[in-house]
């Protein structure tokens, strides 16, 4: 999978500071409300394949009334095997690792294929709180988000300070994913 389009690398990198972890629930709710308005207005539906956020993105959206008008569905593909079962090529995982932007992009493509009627596909993968012995080169505190809409693909690589609470790490990834969805549909 090639992350270079038109001679430009299709990947943005963000380093999250500790101060950005304040008031995450409020920030997420506010962003979801804005996103719901935009998606309803444009009659768009989304679907997500989530790994490290364990369904947290879909949960955050469905916490706000009106989510059923924009969500087609989602799936949690936590293990490598589950990603493969849902169409992420095993060779892609072996070449780039399960935590890569390439795998996040494949997850986003596959969820659109799997959940019919979705125009926006989201793939989220990352390593939150413990090193993975299968992938020793991957450090704790990183995630990759891919959002696909029409012919556009936005990929965000996020680095954040390791958190004692996994909930906070998931929340920052969810916030950045919501921002990316808004960015791609504008």
Give residue ranges: language-model regions:
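Short alpha-helical segments enriched in small residues
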Residues: 2-186
């Amino acid at each position: 999978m090639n992350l270079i389009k038109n001679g430009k690398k299709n990947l943005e990198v963000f380093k999250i500071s500790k101060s950005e972890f304040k008031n995450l629930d409020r920030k997420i709710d506010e962003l979801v409300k804005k996103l719901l308005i935009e998606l309803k207005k444009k009659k768009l539906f989304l679907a997500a394949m989530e790994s490290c956020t364990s369904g947290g993105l879909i949960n955050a959206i469905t916490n706000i009334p009106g989510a059923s008008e924009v969500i087609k569905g989602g799936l949690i593909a936590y293990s490598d095997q589950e990603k493969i079962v849902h169409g992420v090529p095993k060779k892609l995982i072996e070449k780039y690792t399960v935590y890569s932007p390439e795998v996040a992009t494949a997850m986003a493509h596959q969820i659109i294929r799997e959940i019919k009627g979705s125009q926006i596909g989201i793939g989220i993968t990352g390593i939150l709180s413990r090193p993975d012995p299968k992938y020793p080169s991957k450090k704790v505190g990183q995630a990759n988000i891919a959002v696909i809409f029409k012919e556009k693909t936005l990929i965000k690589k996020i680095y954040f300070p390791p958190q004692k609470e996994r909930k906070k790490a998931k929340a920052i990834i969810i916030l950045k994913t919501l921002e990316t969805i808004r960015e791609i549909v504008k």
